[in-house]
Amino acid sequence: MPSGGDQSPPPPPPPPAAAASDEEEEDDGEAEDAAPPAESPTPQIQQRFDELCSRLNMDEAARAEAWDSYRSMSESYTLEGNDLHWLACALYVACRKSVPTVSKGTVEGNYVSLTRILKCSEQSLIEFFNKMKKWEDMANLPPHFRERTERLERNFTVSAVIFKKYEPIFQDIFKYPQEEQPRQQRGRKQRRQPCTVSEIFHFCWVLFIYAKGNFPMISDDLVNSYHLLLCALDLVYGNALQCSNRKELVNPNFKGLSEDFHAKDSKPSSDPPCIIEKLCSLHDGLVLEAKGIKEHFWKPYIRKLYEKKLLKGKEENLTGFLEPGNFGESFKAINKAYEEYVLSVGNLDERIFLGEDAEEEIGTLSRCLNAGSGTETAERVQMKNILQQHFDKSKALRISTPLTGVRYIKENSPCVTPVSTATHSLSRLHTMLTGLRNAPSEKLEQILRTCSRDPTQAIANRLKEMFEIYSQHFQPDEDFSNCAKEIASKHFRFAEMLYYKVLESVIEQEQKRLGDMDLSGILEQDAFHRSLLACCLEVVTFSYKPPGNFPFITEIFDVPLYHFYKVIEVFIRAEDGLCREVVKHLNQIEEQILDHLAWKPESPLWEKIRDNENRVPTCEEVMPPQNLERADEICIAGSPLTPRRVTEVRADTGGLGRSITSPTTLYDRYSSPPASTTRRRLFVENDSPSDGGTPGRMPPQPLVNAVPVQNVSGETVSVTPVPGQTLVTMATATVTANNGQTVTIPVQGIANENGGITFFPVQVNVGGQAQAVTGSIQPLSAQALAGSLSSQQVTGTTLQVPGQVAIQQISPGGQQQKQGQSVTSSSNRPRKTSSLSLFFRKVYHLAAVRLRDLCAKLDISDELRKKIWTCFEFSIIQCPELMMDRHLDQLLMCAIYVMAKVTKEDKSFQNIMRCYRTQPQARSQVYRSVLIKGKRKRRNSGSSDSRSHQNSPTELNKDRTSRDSSPVMRSSSTLPVPQPSSAPPTPTRLTGANSDMEEEERGDLIQFYNNIYIKQIKTFAMKYSQANMDAPPLSPYPFVRTGSPRRIQLSQNHPVYISPHKNETMLSPREKIFYYFSNSPSKRLREINSMIRTGETPTKKRGILLEDGSESPAKRICPENHSALLRRLQDVANDRGSH
């Protein structure tokens, strides 16, 4: 490696082989360059494959396709572990692809059961899912096949969760199988005998999974599937009561039994009782939902089974199939029908949950209903834990608390089940929508009519159009199209109710913040309404099918995710009744958008950056000052990443710009880019290509208007900028007065809405001495004219120009800044409340939280953490193309590694990724599959700026890179060494299903670091090496808030909220009641309880205030800036209140 003097980092360390053996890897394997070279299949493998195909009776076409696929993969990748497992993946793909379905009938001879494939290949189901995901990556299978596999895994997960609920519920209704007497072998003519509890247990489960499979729209819906199970138990229980041996079947302690059940002469009623309501109350069900499933899905389906003779008995009241003469044939017919369904569809045979070897086949769970002893062996306990580990690993059916929210929300308690969590979420949704209709309320109608342009009809038309789009995506088999449409209609109706409810709350909040401002402009924003309805639909879908189906809804409505994220915080703040799981789900969605989805090549984000002169705002520009660390060692002035702050004067406030502590308004979120971006283009001069700058883009129309102000003797001309316009303050004009004297004076102008600037001279006399300008506009000095251009936001300022003055020539003053220097005026950065600023504020906050967590786990000092942050911010600001089609966490991990390397505090990528995997959002694909090279669409920016190119970023900004040595690393030296039976390496070249895309190259994180990242960052990172004593100042680091970010409603029945305590200066007038935790006496709590019970407010001057707060601690403390007298008065008041 060539030497680079003191500025060169040390060479990479040798591969940490010893450390790798101690590393516990969660995944089956890693992308590993040091893996053994791939080889062709051996004759032994081919022999095992032939034996496997013979046992499965595989047809020749699928057999040949599977072998060709396996041979191709084994030649390209190292397939570690059991060969049969990989062969099973190839066979499964071949079975699903090789034989087309000609009709909707069954194709029993063509499809091979997945359960048989797994059994013959000696592979558990969970192992199969892990291997299959990697096979899909290597074979680059199309998206629809991947979706099918994901749905298969989700169906399995739902069934596994429901089976764990099925066992205790069944035991609650029926007796234990252990209490049954063993059957005696009888003659052939005496076979028909009453059914047993064990047979009913098996029959009820098979009936349920057969029905669930025939409702594809709810087969992976946890809530509806659970209610379908309750319907099956309700039906079987009603039939059991009709049996002559009912007292041998039913649990005598079941709380749903009738009062006369234990009487000797009790007789069953002709119509079986309904115990849906009792089951819901005992086992976390929703009565309304369960009864709806029973009436609209279950009962019509069971009647069809009677019509097809699959169930025998009395069709009129759906009974009789448990009678001795009918049960055997019914059980046999249902089992056969289910087998045909599994073979035709290719789904998992979910009867394996009932098998004696269920642990080996699933990789999971032992049954509670077993004939053995009640105590489980250590082996069975270990096998039982495998399923839970799978759920924890895949985060199936649960929402992990995002890292940004772990300070505010506890994780679920161990006793909470996925079913109870899902039903609770849906119950909260029903509570929120009680009494509402899918139309605007009278209050909302009145608000909309007050707008200058009533948007009511446009809103209704938009919802109708979106409903039609939503319904079109629910078109399953013809037999169940009506059911699918009914579910789609129901979900959309709930979403409409929620939409109008939230819209009303949002408008009311906007009116409180903006006063009487007309909201027509915002309410006509199509992106806002589509995003809001999509958000409501996502909440409804999540309530029925956790963890939701994001981004399916945004895709069908074609809502750009950059716009969708804006409505999430608005939605959460506007609706206080959301349960914690929904809030976590929405927060997860927002984080996904911020960390990678908004950075896709087709995202509108790149257009926003282009409109901002291809400039990404810094963290200091978008963060409120109180949200930044201000340590003594952090120097702000002169930093290339943290330009010096200048005073802002807003045209709409009449004073200095205030830091933003209140939530950003909807108007700001969806407002157009500020005019400053257009103003800057006027003064941008073309840079030479060698400087790597951005050429000026001069619009064709003239932007500068010379306005002569003549014949004004004895009068004053007032020029008052309207709110939002900008007064340009740094330009010069050559002026000829009446006496012929020519002077050069400063001129000031106003930018109009078309992007042009109209200049006006500062007040001047014939002697050429500039006089003071009234208002807050200061005359420009010679030093200012020699500097760079800037502008100020002004308000309410009158520019007075007496005398006769004519502008002859206007020449912009100042010189073009060199590339790499940041412009230090307020015109060069977006407003803190602009949509682009809001996006990057959230991005920086998210990155800061994740980086702080990683640094704590890696034992990185605060000083190094700030250097890492500065490097990360540099990569976002100066090299935004590094984020295109990549992930925020990838840049964070690379920044940690490079800054630790240059400061001689080496942290291996192996340890960095190990700590990264502990974060809730972590996915192995983030470091396994990183974009290296690929053809992506060019942003049509009209500029030759190298950042507008999305191909190889290594060609960009060459002035920031050098040919010296850099801290490169080999993949084999950092990624964990694969363990036995590990997965194959991640493929590096994917051909893609899209023919118009050239071959895309992906690799692991180390390849990205060596080939792309370090070439962009090396020059900047080396400035912080120990050998460099003149390191640039560090960027301020965002700190983590200590208070809860939102208020919480304590009860749905009372408007009582809990939220962080505000500073005294920010409190509203004291007409409310206050209670300060750890400070106010208990007497106040008694008064509050009395007020809630009676509805009467105590006649006290002090009490409790639980309303929306800011970021202050909840504990009562006096503000530091209060006088001693106020603190003494507060102490006296508290003392008096305690007596």
Swiss-Prot record:
<feature type="modified residue" description="Phosphothreonine">
    <location>
        <position position="417"/>
    </location>
</feature>
<feature type="region of interest" description="Disordered">
    <location>
        <begin position="654"/>
        <end position="678"/>
    </location>
</feature>
<feature type="compositionally biased region" description="Acidic residues">
    <location>
        <begin position="21"/>
        <end position="33"/>
    </location>
</feature>
<keyword id="KW-0238">DNA-binding</keyword>
<dbReference type="InterPro" id="IPR002719">
    <property type="entry name" value="RB_B"/>
</dbReference>
<feature type="modified residue" description="Phosphoserine">
    <location>
        <position position="966"/>
    </location>
</feature>
<feature type="modified residue" description="Phosphoserine">
    <location>
        <position position="981"/>
    </location>
</feature>
<feature type="region of interest" description="Disordered">
    <location>
        <begin position="810"/>
        <end position="831"/>
    </location>
</feature>
<dbReference type="GO" id="GO:0030154">
    <property type="term" value="P:cell differentiation"/>
</dbReference>
<feature type="glycosylation site" description="O-linked (GlcNAc) serine">
    <location>
        <position position="420"/>
    </location>
</feature>
<dbReference type="InterPro" id="IPR028309">
    <property type="entry name" value="RB_fam"/>
</dbReference>
<protein>
    <recommendedName>
        <fullName>Retinoblastoma-like protein 2</fullName>
    </recommendedName>
</protein>
<feature type="modified residue" description="Phosphoserine">
    <location>
        <position position="971"/>
    </location>
</feature>
<dbReference type="GO" id="GO:0006325">
    <property type="term" value="P:chromatin organization"/>
</dbReference>
<keyword id="KW-0991">Intellectual disability</keyword>
<dbReference type="GO" id="GO:0005730">
    <property type="term" value="C:nucleolus"/>
</dbReference>
<feature type="region of interest" description="Domain B">
    <location>
        <begin position="828"/>
        <end position="1024"/>
    </location>
</feature>
<feature type="modified residue" description="Phosphoserine">
    <location>
        <position position="1035"/>
    </location>
</feature>
<feature type="compositionally biased region" description="Polar residues">
    <location>
        <begin position="941"/>
        <end position="955"/>
    </location>
</feature>
<feature type="compositionally biased region" description="Low complexity">
    <location>
        <begin position="964"/>
        <end position="973"/>
    </location>
</feature>
<feature type="modified residue" description="Phosphoserine">
    <location>
        <position position="413"/>
    </location>
</feature>
<dbReference type="GO" id="GO:2000134">
    <property type="term" value="P:negative regulation of G1/S transition of mitotic cell cycle"/>
</dbReference>
<dbReference type="InterPro" id="IPR024599">
    <property type="entry name" value="RB_N"/>
</dbReference>
<keyword id="KW-0156">Chromatin regulator</keyword>
<feature type="compositionally biased region" description="Pro residues">
    <location>
        <begin position="8"/>
        <end position="17"/>
    </location>
</feature>
<feature type="modified residue" description="Phosphoserine">
    <location>
        <position position="1080"/>
    </location>
</feature>
<dbReference type="GO" id="GO:0005694">
    <property type="term" value="C:chromosome"/>
</dbReference>
<dbReference type="InterPro" id="IPR002720">
    <property type="entry name" value="RB_A"/>
</dbReference>
<feature type="region of interest" description="Pocket; binds E1A">
    <location>
        <begin position="417"/>
        <end position="1024"/>
    </location>
</feature>
<feature type="compositionally biased region" description="Pro residues">
    <location>
        <begin position="977"/>
        <end position="987"/>
    </location>
</feature>
<feature type="modified residue" description="Phosphoserine">
    <location>
        <position position="639"/>
    </location>
</feature>
<keyword id="KW-0131">Cell cycle</keyword>
<feature type="modified residue" description="Phosphoserine">
    <location>
        <position position="948"/>
    </location>
</feature>
<feature type="region of interest" description="Domain A">
    <location>
        <begin position="417"/>
        <end position="616"/>
    </location>
</feature>
<keyword id="KW-0043">Tumor suppressor</keyword>
<keyword id="KW-0325">Glycoprotein</keyword>
<feature type="modified residue" description="Phosphothreonine">
    <location>
        <position position="642"/>
    </location>
</feature>
<dbReference type="Pfam" id="PF11934">
    <property type="entry name" value="DUF3452"/>
</dbReference>
<feature type="modified residue" description="Phosphoserine">
    <location>
        <position position="672"/>
    </location>
</feature>
<feature type="modified residue" description="Phosphoserine">
    <location>
        <position position="982"/>
    </location>
</feature>
<dbReference type="GO" id="GO:1990841">
    <property type="term" value="F:promoter-specific chromatin binding"/>
</dbReference>
<dbReference type="GO" id="GO:0000977">
    <property type="term" value="F:RNA polymerase II transcription regulatory region sequence-specific DNA binding"/>
</dbReference>
